Amino acid sequence: MNGVNDIRETFLGFFEKNGHARRPSAPLVPQNDPTLLFVNAGMVPFKNIFTGAEKPFAPRATTSQKCVRAGGKHNDLDNVGYTARHHTFFEMLGNFSFGDYFKDDAVALAWELVTKEYGLDAKRLLVTVYAEDEEAPAIWKKVAGLDDSRIIRIATSDNFWSMGDTGPCGPCSEIFFDHGDKVAGGPPGSPDEDGDRFIEIWNLVFMQFEQHEGGKRTNLPKPSIDTGMGLERVAAVLQGVHNNYDIDLFRALIAAEEEVYGQKASGDKTASFRVIADHLRTSAFLVADGILPSNEGRGYVLRRIMRRAMRHGHMLGAREPQMHRLVPALVAEMGKAYPELGRAQVAIEAAIEQEEARFQRTLGNGLSLLDKAASELSPGEALPGDVAFRLSDTFGFPLDLTQDILRGRGIEVDVDGFETALDAQRETSRAGGFSSGDQATEEIWFSVRDEKGPTKFTGYSSTAGEGRLIAIAAGGALIETVTAGPAELVFDATPFYAESGGQAGDHGEIVFEDGARFVVRDVQKRAGDLHVHIGELVSGSVKTGMKAQMSVNAARRKAVMANHSATHLMHAALRKVLGPHVTQKGSLVEADRFRFDFSHGAPVTAAQLEAIEDEVNAQIRANIETGIKVTTPDKAIEAGALALFGEKYGDEVRVLSMGDAGEGGRPYSVELCGGIHVSRSGDIAVFTILSEGGVSAGIRRIEGATGAEALAYLKGRAQIAADVAESLKVPLKDLPRRVASLTEERRTLERELSEAKRKLAMGGGGGAPAGPEVINGVNLIARVAEGVGGKELRALVDEAKSKIGSGVVVFVGVDGGKAGVAIGVTKDLTEKFSAVELVKAAAAAIGGQGGGGRPDMAQAGGPDGDKANEALEAVRAALKG
């Protein structure tokens, strides 16, 4: 039972057995909470239930919640790898009561789990309580038989939890495990409490008060329970180790690292292995939840975490991407508990590999700059902020990475100077760029949502409807009245679809009761379920409370619906033609076309694209009715419906079934989707693929079209083919054969031309002597080759070297006004003459810089093709000494 997976399952199973609804972990991106970068505690997904904004789905629940603490208020990044219990990613086991049971049952359940299910020695357990909480000590004495010496009263806020300045709050009680007097450290509340002897394993929060402005507290009508047990911490206790990185999960990851990096996790390398293991988990789970590395927001936090791990990989000797090779080991350890890891494995590996390849290109140069700048500092002097900024801006070093590198050298960074340089860049960008400040912020929309409630969407079966205006925003702020110009409007109900799931928002028109007209150019979801209509008031004036008739552009929606439905059929076709590893990684569905990103490790061949087109069009011709079913996410996925990785689903989901049922009676495509679709597959009319290409490592993109746009594209292609056939004076059916014949003729002519150029160059054409000249006793073949470059130039040098026996060969190829130089030195002369040094002299003559290669073969280029002979003279001068 001591393995991490068993410990997790024991916790969840125990509470499930005791009437708790087992819920899967919520995604790491918080829903309906703009104040958090990431979910950082088990209660975060239930915040709206605790505040009363949402009704509980069950009276009690249990979860193992994915959490990330990196960036913002809760940031453990700097400590990870150097302490026993800091992580950027961790799992929080929790049980929750939403007004059901309270302190007595919470304590009884906790004590039963730790002493009976986990088998911890009760004599080695002690608890803390809030000093003003008189109930908790009595309950601990009654339930666990603890005496006063093992119930420690804490008067500080460490044992009082609050959600903020106002809202639900209450005292805490923490359970500690005593490792014994052989380990340094004192009990909680003592001067030595930071030692490793007494380890907190569980925090029970008794949510019993409402905090009001001014500090007043009143009793909640329905007190609740929120508990949090760090899985990694309790696993360390149960496995008898003092460091979280010594539990079985991390041992397996570090063993995989040792194999990948070819080093042992010992001595001063230990911290690097631990950093990589921790950051691998964070990186993988964030990518699985739909976040990719970028330069802003959550994507930037992910980039910082990835690059910190990759720098430690560089310290272990990695000079090419390696971290992605650890993903299979992580999936093996955690994929059963978190199936999204397996579903997203290809995307995770691709994202990590691509980021490391990008970082490797600048890491060496950045480290060189940092080393040089650090070596020039006086003792106690901080690294200048402008240097740290250059490392960030030019070499991709996040500030905390620079700080982490310098920490071991005892050097600090001038953070104020860094911020000054960053602000200067922002001002420059702002002066020359576009600000999006005209749109209302997410916080504003949350206030509207809290006060007015969600928008009721009526557009699944209609393109028209009536709504009452409940909010207006313009210039980035809420207003009561708008008279003209751009604005954002929210109604209590709307037939307008808001962009989500890749499907573009509706366009259309809204006419108010007094005749005012608003043109809708986009609809976006804000605060979870508000439909914000973005557009322009073209006549009249409107104010909140007014009613309006709302009309969606039906023709445009029909085109969007056809494209959206086509992506579902194409997704199924991709999995059939390419394999079941294909999963959707993103999409954008517009009226005129769509794009669809998916996991696949190689370009899709022409034959495969044709097969995919044929599959989809066969389903369109079958004209099967589209099926819609509303169910729970778990039941839908159990029934085989595909879910988009990283997507947040509510308690109920729409399951879309499309296409002809095959063997077993299962429809061709079954997916979770809240979008709007055609009623029959035949409504799509026709489907065609416009393009296929790579987006990033392991991710491909197909763009396509349906209906009138597809027909127009196909007609255009047919017309091009007809025009080409006419110009070549062949029947259309013979065009492929004629083009193939012309292509082969061109190849033959190119080969003949290349051979003629080679013979001309080797024979000393253009006035050069046919044989070698001799300079200081060294044979030299020096030629200008017109129209020759690249590999052909190198081949000429190799051929001439084989004939000259001993000597130096230089060819300057001139093509398109530019020059290329290739120089070869026979092996008997490489100690006296280096091709690399000779090519530098030649390159300077034609306006080039440097060059590269080996002592026996080197190449360079330059922009001045008319100075080819000067390049030859430069080599002659070098041989003369």
Swiss-Prot record:
It catalyses: tRNA(Ala) + L-alanine + ATP = L-alanyl-tRNA(Ala) + AMP + diphosphate. Its cofactor is Zn(2+). CDD domains: AlaRS_core. Keywords: Aminoacyl-tRNA synthetase, ATP-binding, Cytoplasm, Ligase, Metal-binding, Nucleotide-binding, Protein biosynthesis, RNA-binding, tRNA-binding, Zinc. SMART domains: tRNA_SAD. The keyword Zinc applies. One of its GO terms (cellular component) is cytosol. GO terms for molecular function: alanine-tRNA ligase activity; aminoacyl-tRNA deacylase activity; ATP binding; tRNA binding; zinc ion binding. Zn(2+) binds at H564, H568, C673, H677. Belongs to the class-II aminoacyl-tRNA synthetase family. HAMAP family: Ala_tRNA_synth_B. This is Alanine--tRNA ligase. It comes from Hyphomonas neptunium (strain ATCC 15444). The lineage of its organism: Bacteria, Pseudomonadati, Pseudomonadota, Alphaproteobacteria, Hyphomonadales. The gene is alaS.
